Amino acid sequence: MPNRRHFIQRSATLLALAAAAPWLPRFAFAADPTQLLQRAIPSSGEKLPVIGLGTSRTFDVRLDDASLKPLDEVLRTFINGGARLIDTAPSYGASEAVTGELLKRTNTQGKAFLATKISATGRERGMAQFEASLKALQTDKLDLVQVHNLQDTRTQLALLRELKAQGKVRYIGITHYIESAHDDLLAVLAQEPVDFVQLNYSVGERNAEKRLLPYCADHGIATLINRPFQRAQLLSRVKGRALPDWAMETDATSWAQLLLKFILANQAVTAVIPATSNPRYMADNLQAGQGRLPDAALRAKIVQAFT
């Protein structure tokens, strides 16, 4: 049965063929964007491709050609595959600067939906951090800015509303990455209007299904999902195992795709943002945004496979 290694080997073969014969179909590395599932941002109706790109750790590299080369390929694969949403943060080391440089090098600044965060205490520090993000990302406005891990939430949301009114930010939101913070996210949502919530949700962390995701669906709040693989912990559980036959019913060809499709099958999810520094993993992840999604019975089988 196909697995992630099989997919990567097949992708490498097709890449070699494409280099030798550029008239051949480009497979997932230049997939038809219309094949990538899109979902609407409830507050505006604007549609986003369901597969985004996280940059935590993976984009925290030196700004030299050797370090940027694989990430350049990741970004080209991402954009050529019809995806748009890139999520970064000032606390991710060099990730913002690397993202900005790569977008400039690939001339894809106008194609990306840029999301970053504020993790500061006090309005002045929040504003300074926002301005530093603009400089690092080489832009004069951002699509989405989120209060990172609910740090000084009310102060920073007030600032973000000002920036939104000025046209410097299109959407605002809040984030967290642990299940124990879900009640805190809900408490903020009950009092503060936002466009987006970013949260952790995966086969191994399903607490969001109980209250947080239903609340967002009912109140028109877009959701971005982080930690879809739990920092690769979930993939390590199935390393070396072949995909079960029933995975074909979801059109998944790797365990990673199966994990992402599990998340996307929840209609309250707007997009998922797996991070990677590997172009072939990026192509693999994009495949999860195409084809069929698992129904309730198949989702139960996916959970069992990782238990």
Q: What are the residue ranges of the model-derived segments?
A:
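A cross-domain feature marking catalytic cores of carbohydrate-active enzymes
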Residues: 52-57, 88-90, 116-118, 146-149, ...
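Conserved, mostly hydrophobic/aromatic
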Residues: 41, 53, 86, 99, ...
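Generic structural signal for well-ordered alpha-helices
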Residues: 38, 75, 96, 100, ...
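N-terminal binding-site loop/beta-alpha segment at the start of enzyme catalytic domains
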Residues: 2-110
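Glycine/proline-rich, positively charged
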Residues: 62, 121-207, 211, 218-224, ...
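A generic structural signal for well-ordered alpha-helical segments
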Residues: 78, 107, 164, 216-217
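Structured C-terminal cap/extension of enzyme domains
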Residues: 14-17, 23, 41, 211-307
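Short, electropositive alpha-helical surface patch
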Residues: 100-107, 113, 284-291
